[in-house]
Amino acid sequence: MSSALLSARDLVAAGTALLQRALATLDDAALAEPTALAGWTRAHVVAHVAANAEALVNLTTWARTGVETPMYASPEQRESDIEKGALLAPARLRDWFSTSAAGLDDALGLLDGESWTRLVRTAQGRTVPATEVPWMRTREVMVHAVDLDGGVGFDDLPTDFLLEVLHDAAAKRSRGADGPAVVLVSTDPTDTLDGTPRSTAWPVVGLGDAVTVRGPLPQLAAYVTGRRATGLTAETGTLPVLPHWL
């Protein structure tokens, strides 16, 4: 396995640990409390992340065998799995999260060089190589660890992840181009752990003249992923409202 893939799997493990940490701070009653995600309790978030792990196992099966195995049978099945999962007894829900995460880790470990290059299809319909699967999981566990509101914030997420999610979310928003045009500018040092300089500005193609939004890296990541952000300034004085991210 290449060093890049090892690093990608390390980020998955780090995100899983952060979400597990947030989940461990919450008692069973807290799982029924609402989150900032419309219509979702904390239990919905946990169920979604658990179901996502199983869906990504389907993509690893596709990559390993060459037999088309979609993430979900249908959008309706995806929603149904989340709703049913949110109603599980708290102990079963916690166990589902843990076992599904471990199952995905095992499935990723079965992929070889040829498997990693095989093309699979995301739930959004994009065709990507299987090397994208670790990133897809990292994005889920990192951001939803924050959504649980269990003591993990964007400030706790690794710098390498923040940089990558800014690039990823800005690119996705630019493909849709259905929201306001903005340029996100970090006011923080953004060198990675190995000292390699990285971008400090991320343009989002959209409607109207681009508005420059400045602030700390973690808060820019929160903003571009549609989460509550603080400490940001917009040159117009008002932060543009971004549409739904994923």
Enumerate the language-model features and the residues they cover.
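Short, helix-capping/interhelical loops that line the mouth of catalytic, cofactor-
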Residues: 1-7, 55-103
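Structured surface interface patches that mediate subunit assembly and partner/cofactor docking
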Residues: 2-8, 61-68, 110-246
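Alpha-helical scaffold segments that form or flank carboxylate-/histidine-based iron centers
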Residues: 2-11, 30-52, 80-93, 120-139, ...
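Short, Lys/Arg-rich amphipathic segments at extreme N-termini
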Residues: 9, 13-31
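Structural signal for well-ordered, non-membrane alpha-helices
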Residues: 16, 20, 24, 53-57, ...
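Short, conserved sequence motifs enriched in acidic/basic residues, glycine, and aromatics
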Residues: 25, 36-39, 110
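Conserved catalytic core of Hanks-type protein kinase domains
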Residues: 25, 48, 223
